[in-house]
A protein has these predicted regions:
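Conserved, carboxylate-rich catalytic/transport cores that coordinate ions
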Residues: 1-205
Length: 205
């Protein structure tokens, strides 16, 4: 809990593939055209050399937006993100907004506190643009008939559905067995839960 364990060799994750302020980094850039309805109308990929002029924390970016004094590029980014978010909401997706927990250690090295990190729109901005870029990459690979690995989300087993039904019953919610299970169904169930604590528990169930 008190350290980061990188998935890649540290020379890649902390240096070569890390966007550091004031340093050039080779990259593949995804150019997206997004219309007023939040639909990605076209995309293209190019090789690029990226230089980060200034690193900014999620909390700082959110504070600038909330205060109304964010630079123009950040305001434009937020405006386009709102279009993407509205289009995504219209598709009625299953959105598991799971809280991130941080384990705080005391001076003796023992767990002193487990804190929930607040999720900000700034986090969602980055996530939604990453998803849009990933979708564009998938379409580009499919268009080339490239051999790729697909991630398939299997439907929940009957045992898991029964467990979920029993859990929802504790919140006076019903899940009828035998109906067609879709992401939209789970989204509707979560949307109907107004209590934030219960909603978070439902997402993790």
């Amino acid at each position: 809990p008190d350290r980061v364990v990188p998935m890649l060799p540290e020379i890649l994750s902390a240096d070569v593939c890390s966007l550091k302020e004031g340093e050039d980094r080779a990259a593949m850039a995804c150019h997206l055209k997004i219309d007023a309805k939040g639909k990605v109308t076209s995309h293209r990929f190019t090789r690029a050399l990226v230089r980060i002029h200034h690193n900014i924390a999620y909390e700082d970016a959110q504070a600038r937006i909330d205060a109304g004094d964010a630079p123009e590029f950040l305001q434009n980014l937020w405006a386009v993100w709102k279009l993407l978010a509205a289009a995504r909401e219209a598709r009625d997706p299953l959105e598991l907004d799971l809280p991130e927990r941080r384990i705080m250690l005391g001076e003796d090295g023992q767990i002193a506190e487990i804190a929930v990190r607040e999720r900000l729109d700034a986090h969602r901005v980055v996530e939604d643009f990453m998803i849009a870029a990933n979708v564009a990459a998938a379409k580009a690979l499919e268009a080339k008939a490239a051999q790729v690995v697909y991630r398939v989300h299997e439907p929940p087993s009957r045992e898991k559905l029964i467990a979920l039904r029993d859990y929802l019953a504790t919140m006076d919610r019903k899940l009828a067995m035998g109906q067609v299970i879709t992401p939209g169904l789970f989204h509707a169930i979560l949307k109907d839960v107004s209590d934030e604590a219960e909603k978070a528990q439902g997402m993790e169930a």
